[in-house]
Amino acid sequence: MDLSNLTLTKIQELVLTKKCKIYDILLAYKNNYELNKDINGYIEFFDDSLEIAKRYDDFLRNCELEDLPLIGMLIAVKDNISIQDKSLTCASEILKGYISPYDATVIKRLKNKGAILIGRTNMDEFAMGSTCEFSYYGATLNPLNREYVIGGSSGGSAAVVAAFQAPFSLGSDTGGSVRLPASFSGILGFKPSYGGLSRYGLASYASSFDQIGFFAHSIEDIALILKHTCGADKMDSTSVDIFDDFYPLKIESLQGKNLAVIKELGEDLMDKNVASSFAKFKFDLLSKGINIKEVSIEEINFILSIYYTISPVEASSNLARYTGLCYGKRMSENLSLNDFYFKHRSNFLSEEVKRRIVLGNYLLSEGYDSKYYSKACEILQNLIIPKFNKLFESCDFIITPTSFVKPFRAGLDFDDPVKMYYSDICTVIANLIGAPAISLPYSKDKEGLSIGMQIIGRSKKDFELLSFSKNVIRELGLNGI
């Protein structure tokens, strides 16, 4: 048996029936990492995870599973989620050397229930990017074809799962940063409803949209980890309870479900391979008795403009704290305070991060706030969110391709940020309206590159979305472990 080709639930089954040790399974994943380090999915593999695995093996020798429902579950973590006594750099030179003094709420909940954190993963610096090429630690490669990007910003978390260097990983999703790399690497990528998981301990990019998300090979794994990490948290006033009676996930017919397709996201806008895959996806669903209707949402044309107005404004505020005085790397030069700030941030932040900070400050400057930022917030709250709420009164889910484009060749788009931003057009919808969404691996092109399909659910109905997705995978025979 290949011990590095398992779901979390299968790992726990083997461990609890004494057929395998946690240590041996973890070692198999570590060996895969050692053999394929060039993928650059991990910034750091935690050596102490092997000691923790040994300790849990000893514990299981004498005890039964009760208070540790996640024992033996191995999870990699994106480098913008705080783990006590571990480095936290957000893949930026400006935070080099910073050690987190506390656990994020999601991390604390995982640890308290027996999960083992096995490493921190690469990302676009401060989660700003769609390719995972904007990292201080270098680009992460796509395990399916190393000449192509993995997608971002959570590319490292996607890569370690796709390359069987971890069975499960945490990422963060602000505008598609979990779903896009999941689509590009042929695995599942799930973004919960806004507030479904506490953001306490997640380094902030755009606080109105940021959400911790999951990568996996199994819907059941996603549902299990969501069950044990979701819920309100006193450390995050935006967190909410989302657990519902759709868990445990049930096997049900797809017959009679109502799906919506957005007219303005037409196939003429897509790469031809994506368009043909999406057409086949719709045909497959129709053949299972699902109803699909095309709806017009003219406001969809504002989606990217709104996202790339609000998110850099919030980023410029959130990243103002990285001055060199409190966190991470610090210069020793004798400068005035303003000169110190200027030189420190100029030297240790990447061009993409500086681009978004400058844009955010410009949009907040006198005379432009009401013209751009306030107007974007007004359109989002008064037009877009109500329009989608109305749509969900007559449909169960919305389907789109995860991305209009296939994975593109690495290194091609550094000088064309607008083209990179365009890859988010389908995924930002769920972030703007606070809804759960998932990317399912659906097809591959002749180069072996993956094309994913996205399903968006109702806000705070995350388990309903996962249940439906499980049945789509089952009835369409989509590949998985």
Swiss-Prot record:
EC number: 6.3.5.7
GO terms of molecular function: ATP binding; glutaminyl-tRNA synthase (glutamine-hydrolyzing) activity
Keyword Secreted part of the UniProt annotation: no
GO BP, one annotated term: translation
Listed InterPro entries: Amidase, Amidase_CS, Amidase_dom, AS_sf, GatA
Domain of life: Bacteria
Protein's UniProt keywords contain Acetylation: no
Active site as annotated: K78, S153, S177
Swiss-Prot/TrEMBL keywords: ATP-binding, Ligase, Nucleotide-binding, Protein biosynthesis
GO cellular component: glutamyl-tRNA(Gln) amidotransferase complex
UniProt catalytic activity: L-glutamyl-tRNA(Gln) + L-glutamine + ATP + H2O = L-glutaminyl-tRNA(Gln) + L-glutamate + ADP + phosphate + H(+)
Function field: Allows the formation of correctly charged Gln-tRNA(Gln) through the transamidation of misacylated Glu-tRNA(Gln) in organisms which lack glutaminyl-tRNA synthetase. The reaction takes place in the presence of glutamine and ATP through an activated gamma-phospho-Glu-tRNA(Gln).
Family: Belongs to the amidase family. GatA subfamily.
Oligomeric form and interacting partners: Heterotrimer of A, B and C subunits.
Protein name, UniProt field: Glutamyl-tRNA(Gln) amidotransferase subunit A
Lineage per the UniProt record: Bacteria, Pseudomonadati, Spirochaetota, Spirochaetia, Spirochaetales
Gene: gatA
